[in-house]
Amino acid sequence: MERSKQSHDNQADSRPTTNESSLNGHFDGLVKKTPGMWDVKGRGTAGESSSHTGSSVVENWKHERTRSIEDNEMSLPSLAAAYTTIIRGLGKDPQRQGLLKTPWRAATAMQFFTKGYQEKIIDVLNDAILDEDHDEMVIVKDIDMFSMCEHHLVPIFGRVHIGYLPNKRVLGLSKLARIVEIYSRRLQVQERLTKQIAVAITEALQPAGVGVVIEATHMCMVMRG
């Protein structure tokens, strides 16, 4: 089975450590914060002053559009109808006993697989950012990650490892896993997922540095050979 290793992160096994040797070299250069900007793997920078960037991002998070329960209920029939069309397109009878409820099951499952669109980062981080005079690297490893490839609509799964160097502020360890879950439970590519996790942590904490590593299996590669 092929595994792709890239710089990303997700939901954790709650094994924090401050021992940098356990991930020796993996975080170096992935995301390094400089005054007023963030830089992810050298692919572009963004930001103004640190304080302005942080506050503006939080405001954007507050007004982020999410998919509501009502949206799910309204879209479920059309989503189920689309699965019915797929079944017919595969040459199968959607009225056959084994397939009769499949469109609704599949539609409900897809809404669950993409439930990250229903959640806001600001709700996760609310009251979870703590003032703490701690300057050693915080590492959370083996966060379980489940996502959907946006190219083929098949699963991506693996583990995320996150490390950051605090700058007078820390985040509750369980919230790192929640950040991973929110961004992974969407239609994704691994590169974007990695960046979104790293940027969320960077903008929330303004740390001295952030590193995100994702080890993932892409079923679009494994199943197709």
UniProtKB/Swiss-Prot annotation:
Subcellular location: Cytoplasm; Nucleus
Associated pathway: Cofactor biosynthesis; 7,8-dihydroneopterin triphosphate biosynthesis; 7,8-dihydroneopterin triphosphate from GTP: step 1/1
Free-text function comment from the UniProt entry: May positively regulate nitric oxide synthesis in endothelial cells. May be involved in dopamine synthesis. May modify pain sensitivity and persistence.
Repeat keyword on record: no
Chain segments carrying region Disordered: 1-59
Name of protein: GTP cyclohydrolase 1
Signal peptide (residue range): none
A Gene Ontology biological process term: tetrahydrobiopterin biosynthetic process
Keywords attached to this entry: Allosteric enzyme, Cytoplasm, GTP-binding, Hydrolase, Metal-binding, Nucleotide-binding, Nucleus, Tetrahydrobiopterin biosynthesis, Zinc
Residue sites binding Zn(2+) per the record: 149, 152, 220
InterPro entries, per database record: GTP-CH-I_C/QueF (IPR043133), GTP-CH-I_N (IPR043134), GTP_CycHdrlase_I (IPR001474), GTP_CycHdrlase_I_CS (IPR018234), GTP_CycHdrlase_I_dom (IPR020602)
Regulation: GTP shows a positive allosteric effect, and tetrahydrobiopterin inhibits the enzyme activity. Zinc is required for catalytic activity. Inhibited by Mg(2+).
Cell membrane as UniProt keyword: no
Catalytic reactions on record: GTP + H2O = 7,8-dihydroneopterin 3'-triphosphate + formate + H(+)
EC number: 3.5.4.16
Location, primary (coarse class): cytoplasm
Sequence ranges of Basic and acidic residues compositional bias: 1-12
A GO molecular-function descriptor: zinc ion binding
Cross-referenced PANTHER family: GTP CYCLOHYDROLASE 1, GTP CYCLOHYDROLASE I
Biased composition (Polar residues): 13-24, 47-58
